[in-house]
Amino acid sequence: MGKIIGIDLGTTNSCVAIMEHGKPVVIQNSEGGRTTPSIVAYTNKGERLVGQVAKNQMVTNPENTIYSIKRFMGRRFEEVASEIKMVPYKVEKGQNGDARVNISNIKKQMSPPEISAATLTKMKETAEAYLGETVTEAVITVPAYFNDAQRQATKDAGKIAGLDVKRIVNEPTAAALAYGIEKKNEEIVAVYDLGGGTFDISILELGDGVFEVKSTNGDTHLGGDNFDDEIIKHLITEFKKDSAIDLSNDKMALQRLKEAAEKAKIELSSAQEASINLPFITADANGPKHLQYTLTRAKFEQMVDHLVQKTKEPCLNAIKDAGLKASDINEVILVGGSTRIPAIQKIVKEIFAQEPNKGVNPDEAVAIGAAIQGGILTGETKDMVLLDVTPLSLGIETLGGVMTKLIERNTTIPTKKSQVFSTAADNQTSVDIKVLQGEREMASQNRVLGNFILDGIPAAPRGVPQIEVSFDIDANGIVHVSAKDMGTGKEQKIRIESSSGLSEEEIERMVRDAEAHAEEDKKLKESIETKNIANSLIYQTEKSLKEYGDKITSEDKEAIENKIKELKDALEGSDVSSIKSKTEELQQASYKIAEMMYKDAQASSSNQDNAQNNAGSESKEADYEVVDEDKK
């Protein structure tokens, strides 16, 4: 088995790590960063940008720059109304009812897994550049509170990126692995994970290399983006008061506000106030307008207090579900960039009555944990066992629209549970099995993961047929369901895929598209490198002509100038092979100058040697004369 990389596919940033010599190593990307912005953009030429280069052009290309796509993963369109308001790009309803992004620069509707696959490809390439070998397998992390559809969407993204996803691991669990890899003592830890778009709290029991999740809770609509949004709304209100101009419909201004809000939030983690200066934010009949504002930490904390408080109830529920008291918890580990906010650290201290542990890097711990899990799967990391749980209850709809639970939340996975049901009407020959996930009593109030029909049931009075429904949750938290008629032995099975998710055909098409993009990216890189070499050669040759043009024949000089012109003409087009051949021709022609430069250098060296010899002779003669003078 080859190397299995660990990827933290984050809302704001992503990170990749690998096990080397028994230790996890975070891999730097091509720009030298240990984390990569989870941002994908398409330029007006249709070129795809990923990571920091995509982030750099966000302000000028807001509608074609996709960030926080994780908030839309595995979600139906009607579930993302609040998220749509937070982004400048266009989110539409897909054919399957899922949320999709319409990218005008390429005139294409793309699914969230397809967009996330671009970030995963960047992580894959980062690891390959470091290892010097092809990478095909990965462990990818997801928020603990992700439902089945969101987990499946993450696996789909991996597949589109050319990765065999060996395991989906919950982010808090991965962070606990990073924290506990060298711990030998038995202890109970809470992992408080507040990232860019999601919040998770998990309680784990650690001891003898066993990492057992006791409970998990969270909110997949809460993260650092929401804190940024509060600052943005405040700045829009204040600017409107001062200038009577509403910036809320100006997408370019909103993008600048987004950047400024994120920067101010980060500054306020270490300073008492942050200055926000955005010159030329807009203009009216009187000329350009500038935004200048000083945001204090006190004001910021007042604005986001409702968000901070929203993390409290999930924590209390997780403690309760684990059958513990806050005082039973030995350590509270902070994960995710948003845990640097002082108000967050303060509420964590209030909930758990202790100072949180800041010993793990909140930006890298999850990727490190994913790499450790990869090491466990390959056998490189020994004596470690991970026991995770399903975050939400699973069941089916039964008579009266009730949800009958087969697997309760916080059940250790993998797991399998079965229950026998019967028909609701006389002579019923088929049953529609509607698979649900959630905690509400009524089926309509929970999420429908999928449904299938078991038919061919012999006609009989209601209550007579015996139908066994089995739920099987694998180690990735992905659900498989089967229904079997005990009388006939007829069975129907499905692996639950979100009713709004991607079909196998769509995934295969997206894999082909991703491969085509990889080929396009390779060609683009080759084109850029070829043009760079050509331009560099033109510059050097023109410079040499100025210095040595008078030392070569007029025929040679004219030939070189013609080759420079031919290469410049080739650079006006996009034919890489033509640029290469014209570069080669100019290289050959310019050897005449190189010969003259070499001869000139030799002559200069010879003259210097002669001069030194002469200088040596003269100095001896002078010495003699001085001594002679002294004798007089």
From Swiss-Prot:
InterPro entries: ATPase_NBD, Chaperone_DnaK, Heat_shock_70_CS, HSP70_C_sf, HSP70_peptide-bd_sf, Hsp_70_fam. The modification Phosphothreonine is found at T198. Residues 600-632 are annotated as: Disordered. Gene3D superfamilies: 1.20.1270.10, 3.30.420.40, Actin, Chain A, domain 4, Substrate Binding Domain Of DNAk, Chain A, domain 1. One of its GO terms (molecular function) is unfolded protein binding. Residues 618-632 have a biased composition (Basic and acidic residues). This is Chaperone protein DnaK. It comes from Borrelia hermsii (strain HS1 / DAH). The gene is dnaK.
